[in-house]
């Protein structure tokens, strides 16, 4: 491995040192191989960036009446209500226990409407049945709870979600008629946040207990609330008050085993605004991932769509994939989940359009950015970490150099990558990115990429880059014997002779 090779070269320069000296150098070497900026290790071995598909495409056929090519996705799951035993399981309000909410369209109260009025035990009993139904076996996968009707932080329930505040205040006033409105509001806030916290925590704890191999988390958590992209001077940053509120949700991050922020785009966002929007949301999620334990951060999987939220039949262009996928990879997240509805798969024509989009734009870009990320990880981190932007707010991306690589779709529907990296390509990685170690490992960033002899990286379905950067050379013998001066050789032979006499004397005793 790279780290072992580094140590071997390091020590070869000190062949004539004493054992004590080597111990000292070993001790000094260890700290330089550590880093304080850890990333979550891969969920699947040798898959540093994971792609998941969470759309109802199971009945969609492409050209030649064949299923859509899902070979690049490690986890696949349909959000349809009757789909079970999937790689991605998403729980909506009607699929996990008795989630209390007020219908935003009809105003109908469901399960008491607010968390203070639900029986937590009844909810957990029902949730247990739902979990075993949707997850009959505990295979590795994602468990995403999508409850968006109310937010556990009181202050974040602004219009139209202020109905949950009003209903909570009314409940307190009914039970405590002597309280003023100010007093009732404060008490309602405390009761709502406690009940909401208990509801979310106990639900996810039950999920982890029953299906521990799944990655449990809540969709849209954490959120940045940086939606003000139409205002002048928009820079995408999260408001300080929202960062503080995310800090106050440490109880939720402590129980989660994954984070699922959202980076959906709409057509109202300019290219610059879209980039800044996504960049800051992913960055905040990565910051939050370290709140439970900075040395063992949670994996971050960004939920995205391949269409716009306000034009659900318009696919993202390659540039817009850069704003979403490219940003997420370059910032060091663990993966992306592509979510979708039946809208882009409702007919044979729409399925063919999706199939063509995947062949010509989506899958080639996934191959591009994934191979570039793996190549950078192999060169800079010896595959024991991920490459992260040195300047998080730059537009540096992990992409294959188009002058040196071509991604092609062969006749059989299989992608191939032609070309090989140059030393200049690797130097670009080193100039723009640094190595962030996985939390389970200690690693050393390669000091000089010029020492790279070869690159050998693959992703799903055998799509690989396998190339020598230097011509193979014959193994050289240690310089101490062949390239030493006569005086050095004499001294060496003298030392060897003394050692031989000592060993012989000990052996004869």
Swiss-Prot record:
SUPFAM superfamilies tied to this protein: (Trans)glycosidases
Membrane topology category: Lipid-anchor; GPI-anchor
Disulphide bridges: 60-351, 224-238, 376-387, 381-435, 437-464
Result for mutant: residue 211 to G: Reduces activity by over 90%
InterPro entries: Aldolase_TIM, Glycoside_hydrolase_SF, Hyaluronidase, Hyaluronidase_PH20/Hyal5
MF terms in GO: hyalurononglucosaminidase activity
GO cellular component, one term: plasma membrane
Listed Gene3D superfamilies: Aldolase class I
Signal peptide: 1-35
Annotated lipid attachment (GPI-anchor amidated serine): 490
Keywords attached to this entry: Cell adhesion, Cell membrane, Disulfide bond, Glycoprotein, Glycosidase, GPI-anchor, Hydrolase, Lipoprotein, Membrane, Signal
Major enzyme class: hydrolase
Tissue: Testis.
Record keyword Nucleotide-binding present: no
Family: Belongs to the glycosyl hydrolase 56 family.
Protein name, UniProt field: Hyaluronidase PH-20
Gene source species: Homo sapiens (Human)
Gene label: SPAM1
């Amino acid at each position: 491995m790279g780290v072992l090779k580094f140590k071997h070269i390091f020590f070869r320069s000190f062949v004539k040192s004493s054992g004590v000296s080597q111990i000292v150098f070993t001790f000094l070497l260890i700290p330089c191989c550590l880093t304080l900026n850890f990333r979550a290790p891969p969920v699947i071995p040798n898959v540093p960036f994971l792609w998941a598909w969470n759309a109802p495409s199971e009945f969609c056929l492409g050209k030649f009446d064949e299923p859509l090519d899902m070979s690049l996705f490690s986890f696949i799951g349909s959000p349809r209500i009757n789909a079970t035993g999937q790689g991605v399981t998403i729980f909506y309000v009607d699929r996990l226990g008795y989630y209390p909410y007020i219908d935003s369209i009809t105003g109908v109260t469901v399960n008491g409407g607010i968390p203070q009025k639900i029986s937590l035990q009844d909810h957990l009993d029902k949730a247990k049945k739902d979990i075993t139904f949707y997850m009959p076996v505990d295979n590795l996968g994602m468990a995403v709870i999508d409850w968006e009707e109310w937010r556990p932080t009181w202050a974040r329930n602004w219009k139209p979600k202020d109905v949950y505040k009003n209903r909570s205040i009314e409940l307190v006033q009914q039970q405590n008629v002597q309280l003023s409105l100010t007093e009732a509001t404060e008490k309602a806030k405390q009761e709502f946040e406690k009940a909401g916290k208990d509801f979310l925590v106990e639900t996810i704890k039950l999920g982890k207990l029953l299906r521990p191999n799944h990655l449990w988390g809540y969709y849209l958590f954490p959120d940045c609330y940086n939606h003000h992209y139409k205002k002048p001077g928009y820079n995408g940053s999260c408001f300080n008050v929202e960062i503080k509120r995310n800090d106050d949700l440490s109880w939720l991050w402590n129980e989660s085993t994954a984070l699922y922020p959202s980076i959906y785009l709409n057509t109202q966002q300019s290219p610059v605004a879209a980039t800044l929007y996504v960049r800051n949301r992913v960055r905040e999620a990565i910051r939050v991932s370290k709140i439970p334990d900075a040395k063992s951060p949670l994996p971050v999987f960004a939920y995205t769509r391949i269409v716009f939220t306000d034009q659900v039949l318009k696919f993202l262009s390659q540039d817009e994939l850069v704003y979403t996928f490219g940003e997420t990879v370059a910032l060091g997240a663990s993966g992306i989940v592509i979510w979708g509805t039946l809208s882009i798969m409702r007919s044979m024509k729409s399925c063919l359009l999706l199939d063509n989009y995947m062949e010509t734009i989506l899958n080639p870009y996934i191959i591009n950015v994934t191979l570039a990320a793996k190549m950078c990880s192999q060169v800079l981190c010896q595959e024991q970490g991920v490459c992260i932007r040195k300047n998080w707010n730059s537009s540096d991306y992990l992409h294959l150099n188009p002058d040196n690589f071509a991604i092609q779709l062969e006749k059989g529907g299989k992608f191939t990558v032609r070309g090989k990296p140059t030393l200049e390509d690797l130097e670009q990685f080193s100039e723009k990115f640094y190595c962030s170690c996985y939390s389970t490992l200690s690693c050393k960033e390669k000091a000089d990429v010029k020492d790279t002899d070869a690159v050998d990286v693959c992703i799903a379905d055998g799509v690989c880059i396998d190339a020598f950067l230097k011509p193979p050379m014959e193994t050289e013998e240690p310089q101490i014997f062949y390239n030493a001066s006569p005086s050095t050789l004499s001294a060496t032979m003298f030392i060897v002779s003394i050692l031989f006499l000592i060993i012989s004397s000990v052996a004869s005793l």
